[in-house]
Swiss-Prot record:
Disulfide bonds join C92-C107. This is Protein Wnt-1. The keyword Lipoprotein applies. One of its GO terms (molecular function) is cytokine activity. A lipid is attached at S1 (O-palmitoleoyl serine).
Length: 126
């Protein structure tokens, strides 16, 4: 017959791009927090510890906000303690706004440009 008596529902994950954009948005809005202490009343033991923004001018984080306790190491400079090599001496792309771009990779230190002329043989036909 042409009737349908069973319906199946399922949940589907969003696209990888959608998830990535969502996480990047949360990451860009993340704030540093400290562990606060509301008081010593034993009745409010569940609320004894809570997260407070490090900067009092910021609003307290919601359960959906991305927060962090420790600052990230400075990846621009060498550090044997954290194992970061730094970015000094690296090659960068002066026209790129991405991670390989000089503005980001050189950490505001400035950079030297080098123009190089390369002559190569090719199988060109005119």
């Amino acid at each position: 017959s042409g009737s349908c008596t069973v319906k199946t529902c399922w949940m589907r994950l969003p696209t990888f791009r959608t998830v990535g954009d969502f996480l990047k948005d949360r990451f860009d809005g993340a704030s540093r927090v400290i562990y606060g202490n509301k008081g010593s009343n034993r009745a409010s033991r569940m609320e004894l510890h809570h997260l407070e923004p490090e900067n009092p001018a910021h609003k307290p984080p919601s359960p959906h906000d991305l927060v962090y306790f420790e600052k990230s190491p400075n990846f621009c400079t060498y550090s044997g303690k954290t194992g970061t090599a730094g970015t000094a001496g690296r090659f960068c792309n002066s026209t790129s706004p991405a991670l390989d771009g000089c503005e980001l990779l050189c950490c505001g230190r400035g950079y030297r440009t080098r123009t190089q002329r390369v002559t190569e043989r090719c199988n060109c036909t005119f």
